[in-house]
UniProtKB/Swiss-Prot annotation:
GO cellular component: plasma membrane
Protein location: Cell inner membrane
Gene: rnfC
Enzyme Commission number(s) of this protein: 7.-.-.-
Name of protein: Ion-translocating oxidoreductase complex subunit C
Positions contributing to [4Fe-4S] cluster 1 binding: C377, C380, C383, C426
List of residues binding [4Fe-4S] cluster 2: C387, C416, C419, C422
Length: 659
């Protein structure tokens, strides 16, 4: 009984919230055997066909290449691309690629030579004899990226799962309408699928391996069961048809019952998932040494007369494949890359097939229905019920329209798998997925700008820290240079130390002065006198400099003229006074010689005249000073004062010398 219960638990499947059941539309192509597309006239190989940076070119225009030859270098998360066939590289130039933006990307243009010659190949008959790192390098150099649509580098994904992987899940659900590439691949190449699973099992050593496939693929289920041949280490799980059961988180929940936390990947709970097409590419790379140069592409839609699945070389133009399937252009023309829910309308039909191109849908005019205009949200909540990721599409829509980036991020916008279930059920015809894609792109752009700003800030701070260190080092060197003694000072110090040493050990005798004698201090006295003389000379120079500064001050021309006039008057009065005094003295001497009384009278007269002359000179000086003050206040007053001074001086002179 316990074994029966354990077996039932082992085969149990779970369900996920949300999801929809759109028309499948798979019978158009799933019942038709795969065909091999012939080589086109030109192949266009974009350098970036995966999630990550493009590789560095290894070829140049005009070079001849062989089938499988690498065109770019593969390092880290850079996945190389290879020549799909042999031929000539005619150009390396931008070209429109399969992207909703319609932007041009750098591509290698190859003109096939028709020979389809391979480069030298080195198959590995027994991969078990190779170590894990050699296997990972082989997968990486083969240019394998996730063929389910994400395009994540497979080798990087496997390397991250070398430790701690409990469950390996092979995604064979292929849940989106119209697409049957994996279905036909399993029907026709089931043995290669199982061999690829064994390679992954050898690499990862998981506890269990599960294949998840929807119940609407009975032929593929039967083919896998035949290929397994009763193997009990790989379990085939058939799950109900429900969109989007092929999502990574949704299929993990269905097969294990575990939910991947928000913001995490399935590897965080010990689960690693690979697509069926990726598994076949791994088998061919490891065992056959064939890089990823072709894939299965579904061509379907009512605008095609012979839909089906084709093995198409990477770089084949879409229009070339459509013509192989009997394309009938519609009005208006519409060709979708991918499915009707997650795909996008191609901007041009000359875009090339890339590694993640699984379907080309060419619907008829009536097949997709008329596109109705977008209307306002009525808050019905149907989008919330349909969301398989457990998000709030209505809130994310408002945040996206209002450019509230942080709120959109906090409401787990990046957990949206863009399945289109919300837009499918919306009665207002709101293209919700388009809003979410645009909001994600804007947030990524802002994050990149913030990262660049943080990097610039870090560089600036590092520069400032370096400049501060250099400044401290310079200051330290300057301090060390300042305290370093010159050669002369060092010699003086050394001589003093030497004298002290000689005195201490008695090698140099002390000078003794006999009693009653004075020491010879003449040299000291002479040095002191010399210093005093130098001090006096410096003091005299300072005084002379101050006088020069005083005399060289800027003087007003009128004030200078007044001062010069006053100086002349003073000099004239002094001469006249001296002349008067001399005359009086001479007269007095003569009179004294003749008569003593007359001499006394003459002397008295001379004293009176001298006193008046002195008073007149004092008055002139006062007037001049007053004139100077007035001139400082007003030039006109100064001129008047000078005139008055001259008049007074003239009167004084007349009083002194009436003759």
């Amino acid at each position: 009984m316990f074994k029966l219960f354990t077996a039932r638990q082992h085969d149990k499947i779970w369900d996920f919230d949300g999801g929809i059941h759109p028309p499948e539309m798979k019978l158009q192509s799933s019942t038709v055997p795969m065909r091999i597309a012939p080589l086109p006239d030109q192949l266009i190989i974009p350098l970036q066909q995966h999630l990550g940076p493009e590789g560095e070119l290894r070829v140049r225009a005009g070079e001849q290449v062989l089938k499988g030859q690498p065109l770019t270098v593969g390092r880290g998360r850079t996945v190389p691309v290879h020549a799909p066939t042999s031929g000539m590289i005619t150009a390396i130039a931008p070209h429109t690629t399969a992207h909703p933006s319609g932007l041009a990307e750098l591509c290698v243009h190859i003109t096939p030579d028709g020979e389809d010659r391979w480069r030298e190949q080195q198959p590995w008959a027994d991969y078990r004899q190779r170590d894990k790192m050699a296997l990972l390098d082989r997968i990486h150099q083969a240019g394998i990226a996730g063929l389910g649509g994400a395009g994540f580098p497979t080798a990087s994904k496997l390397q991250g799962g070398l430790n701690g992987i409990i469950t390996l899940i092979i995604n064979a659900a292929e849940c989106e309408p119209y697409i049957t590439a994996d279905d036909r691949l399993m029907q026709e190449h089931a043995d290669e699928v199982i061999t690829g699973i064994h390679i992954l099992r050898h690499l990862l050593q998981p506890q269990q391996v599960l294949i998840g496939i929807e119940d609407n693929k009975p032929e593929a289920i039967a083919a896998l069961q035949r290929a397994l041949r009763g193997q009990d280490d790989i379990h085939l799980r058939v799950v109900p048809t429900k969109y989007p059961s092929g999502g990574a988180k949704q299929l993990t929940k269905i097969l294990t019952g575990k939910e991947v936390p928000f913001g995490k990947h399935s590897s965080s709970i010990g689960v690693l998932m690979q697509n069926v097409g990726t598994v076949v590419a791994i088998k061919r790379a490891v065992i056959d040494d064939e890089p990823l140069i072709e894939r299965v592409v579904t061509l379907t839609g009512d605008a095609l007369s012979s839909p089906g699945n084709f093995w198409a070389r990477i770089g084949t133009p879409v229009l070339y494949l459509l013509k192989l399937a009997g394309f009938k252009p519609q009005n208006p023309p519409m060709v979708i890359m991918g499915g009707p829910l997650m795909g996008f309308t191609l901007p041009s039909l000359d875009v090339p097939i890339v590694k993640i191109s699984n379907c080309i849908l060419a619907p008829a005019e009536t097949e997709m229905g008329l596109s109705e205009p977008e209307q306002s949200c009525i808050r019905c909540g149907l989008c919330v019920d349909a969301c398989p990721a457990g998000l709030l599409p209505q809130q994310l829509y408002w945040f996206s329209r209002g450019e509230e980036h942080e709120k959109a991020r906090n409401h787990n916008l990046f957990d949206c798998i863009e399945c289109g279930a919300c837009a499918y059920v919306c009665p207002s015809n709101i293209p919700l997925v388009q809003y979410y894609r645009q909001e994600k792109a804007e947030i990524r752009a802002l994050d990149q700008e913030s990262a660049r700003a943080a990097e610039a800030k870090a560089r600036f701070e590092a520069k400032q820290a370096r400049l501060a260190r250099e400044k401290l080092a310079r200051e330290l060197r300057h301090k060390q240079a300042a305290v370093k003694l010159t050669d002369a000072d060092q010699q003086t110090v050394d001589a003093a130390v030497s004298r002290l040493t000689r005195q201490s050990d008695g090698s140099e005798s002390v000078i003794n002065i006999p009693a009653g004698q004075m020491p010879d201090n003449s040299a000291v006295i002479a040095a002191r006198e010399a210093r005093k003389a130098q001090a006096r000379a410096r003091q005299a120079e300072k005084q002379q400099a101050r006088s020069t500064e005083e005399t060289t001050d800027v003087v007003d021309p009128r004030q200078a003229a007044v001062a010069a006039a006053i100086a002349r008057v003073k000099a004239k009065k002094a001469v006249q006074a001296q002349h008067v005094t001399t005359d009086v003295a001479e007269a007095g001497s003569e009179a004294m010689a003749e008569d003593p009384r007359k001499a006394a009278v003459a002397a008295a007269i001379a004293r009176v005249k001298a006193k008046k002359a002195a008073q007149a000179q004092h008055v002139t000086t006062d007037v001049a000073e007053a004139g100077s003050e007035a001139m400082a206040e007003d030039p006109r007053k100064a001129a008047v004062a000078a005139a008055i001074a001259r008049v007074k001086a003239k009167k004084a002179a007349q009083a002194i010398n009436p003759d």
